[in-house]
A protein has these predicted regions:
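Residues forming anionic-ligand binding surfaces in small-molecule and nucleic-acid pockets
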Residues: 107-110
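Active/ligand-binding-proximal structured segments within catalytic/core domains
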Residues: 126-134, 237-241
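Conserved polymerase palm-domain catalytic core
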Residues: 93, 100, 141-145, 149-150, ...
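Amphipathic alpha-helical blocks
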Residues: 76-98
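Non-catalytic, polymerase-adjacent accessory regions of viral genome-replication enzymes
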Residues: 1-83
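Duplex nucleic acid-engaging cores and interfaces of nucleic-acid transaction enzymes
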Residues: 121-131, 139-142, 173
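Conserved small/polar residues in nucleotide/adenosyl-binding loops
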Residues: 332-339
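Short alpha-helical scaffolding segments that buttress acidic/His motifs in well-ordered protein cores
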Residues: 54-55, 129, 208-213
Length: 339
């Protein structure tokens, strides 16, 4: 499975290079790192090369053969020439009104079901066009402790970081938090504000994303909250919502200024190495904490049981006050049964 995912990521990169869109994505990432406020993103989203790239990526996805409420699949788009497809998608963006979403129930291991919302193939293509432009902008603002549904990150990377936290940093106390019905309870208004905070200030694009969120679910109606699982853009939107949590948790220890001097050295890949800073922070006597998040599943690591309890209550209150989300269950993990 991991090999297939790596191959898919490599194929997407090759597609971007083939359509000469990788340079645009790199530019968006660099500008986002510099704090640019993007006001004309729809112009980039509707570029022919972005639309062609989106179609190529959609076509390679096995879900492209799954029909939405209109009964159409990728085979219906294959009949169109590239020129006609580009014009069709550009017209769609000029006044975007999504079609209804087909709802299906997917069985889970515990005997329950997980609802999926399947947009029409054309709406999936529109979402892919948006994703390819938003993703590099958001990647520049996402925290390193987030691993789910991100380029060049995987479950294996998250597991490796968990082992590092417990074995090398000796943070044996873990607060394992499960958000109650996360995908069904995301506030649309809060999410749109978070997009703006990340520098996505194109009002037309914000309106389009709002329309995606409020698309009618066949047989149920128009949702007032939530990001339906099954949509191509939903994983990115969920990371945008919880990115605020990542940075808040980081502010509780690792981003605190330290009075002890330290030398900043880069890793081999050029990314910053925080080891010296963390060593300096440990000298300060502050209670060390860190976290690992994969989508809506996140674990907070610390060095003592009392601190774990404090972190749980602080995180629970923060999620409720800032994001309007509740916790459904909690598990404390300690190094021995006595603890």
């Amino acid at each position: 499975m991991a090999t297939k995912k790596k191959a898919l990521k490599k194929s997407k990169l090759r597609h971007a290079e083939y359509y000469d869109f990788q340079k645009i994505q790199d530019k968006l990432y660099a500008e986002s790192m510099d704090g640019k406020m993007f006001t004309k993103l729809v112009e980039i989203i509707t570029l022919p090369e972005n639309i062609k790239l989106a179609y190529r990526n959609i076509k390679k996805n096995k879900g492209s053969k799954t029909a939405g409420t209109d009964g159409k699949t990728i085979q219906h788009l294959e009949k169109l020439s590239e020129e006609k497809l580009v014009v069709l998608v550009q017209r769609k963006f000029s006044w975007y009104v999504p079609q209804s979403v087909r709802r299906v129930e997917i069985p889970k291991d515990n005997g329950k079901t997980r609802p999926l919302g399947i947009p029409t193939i054309m709406d999936r293509l529109v979402q892919q066009c948006v994703l390819q432009v938003l993703e590099p902008i958001c990647e520049a603002k996402f925290h390193d402790h987030s691993y789910g549904f991100r380029p060049n990150r995987s479950q294996q990377h998250a597991i490796s970081q968990v082992h590092k936290n417990m074995q090398l940093s000796h943070l044996h106390y873990v607060v394992d938090i499960d958000i109650k019905g996360f995908f069904d309870n995301v506030s649309h208004g809060k999410l749109l504000k978070q997009l703006w905070t990340l520098g996505i200030c194109d009002k037309k694009l914000i309106s389009i994303i709002s329309a995606m969120l409020k698309a009618e679910v066949a047989g149920i109606g128009f949702p007032e909250k939530g990001t339906p699982q099954g949509g191509i853009i939903s994983p990115l939107l969920s990371n945008i919502v919880l990115n605020e949590l990542d940075w808040w948790l980081a502010s509780q220890w690792e981003n605190i200024p330290t009075q002890y001097p330290f030398k900043q050295t880069p890793n081999r890949n050029g990314s910053p190495n925080h080891g010296n800073k963390y060593a300096s922070l440990r000298r300060s006597g502050l209670k060390e904490i860190t976290c690992v998040r994969y989508a809506d599943d996140f674990k907070i690591f610390t060095s003592s049981y009392p601190n774990a309890v404090k972190l749980f209550h602080a995180t629970k209150d923060w999620l409720k006050e800032r994001l309007g989300l509740d916790i459904s269950c909690l598990l404390y993990t300690s190094p021995s049964p006595r603890d």
